[in-house]
Each structure stands twice: as structure tokens, then as C-alpha cells.
Amino acid sequence: MAHQFAELMFTQSVKAAQEQYGSRARLEHFTAMAGPNDELTEREAGFIAERDTFYMATVNEDGWPYVQHRGGPPGFLKVLGPKSLAYADFRGNAQLVSVGNVSSNDRVSLILMDYPNRRRLKILGHMRVESSGTDLPEYVAKVERTVYIDVVAFDWNCPQYITQRYTESEFALR
């Protein structure tokens, strides 16, 4: 368990639940031994570059969470630096729920999955949206917005209960 991630996620209510269900002492031990995990390393950058999908959560001004799936070619989510991610946002269904949500609360949570290898990376950050085109020139399609995420913390999650799933190309390699 990453120290910075636990600092942000383990609120008093969460700690009370951990205490009630008997996991608090174990999690305190893991957190105390862990590094801060507030800067992406080559390990995270490589994992992110291989992903062709992720899930992103935002919260609206009424406190309702919204989870969105984002997909593209492998590597469409770019690591710009040890604390910075970006992706090109193309025209979709025009609901703009996530874009609207971050105008009042810029906090965002991402989950990136590697189903075949049962790996999961959770990222917390602050999101900003720029409509003025893109500085991600490798995209040929019209980019409506560029989404930037300032990474605050991340955590690698245990593989337990991750159901293995394969794309056709991944299955062919087995």
C-alpha cells in the first residue's frame, strides 16, 4: 500500500471500517513500510504505455460520482513526466459529464487494468481540460480537448479477484 495513496484515501471513516473489520493494523504496517508513490517511475510509465483503456471517476457538485471508460490505441494515455499525464479527447456523445464535473471539482481517479496478467494501477490526481487543440501531435483525428492530469498519488493493487480477460490478439499469443 502506497503511503501517499493511503494518506488521501484512508479518512477517519475508512479507518473506522478497517478497525471494525480487522484490517487496520495490517494496512498501517504496509503503509509505514511503503514509499510515497507520488511520482511515476519507469515501471508505471511502461504499464501506462501498454494500456488501450482505462476507467476514470469524477464527482459532480452535488457529490454524485461518475465513472467513464476511455479507450484508444495502446499508449493513448501519455506520461508527460513523473507527475503528469495527458490524453487527447475526441468528439463523443457530447454529454461532457467528466469535463463538466472537473470545472467544479478537479479531483479524478483512474483505474488502469491489465486483465491477462491480473495487474491494476490506481491513480489519483487533479484534472484540467484545454480546448485549444492539442500538443499531442501524433494524433491525426480532430482533437476537441486535451486532458491533463497532475498525479498526486498511485497504488498498485493486489491481483486477487481480477478476472483474466483477453483480446483476440492476446488470446492468439497464448
Predicted regions and their residues:
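Binding-site signature for planar aromatic cofactors or substrates
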Residues: M1-R174
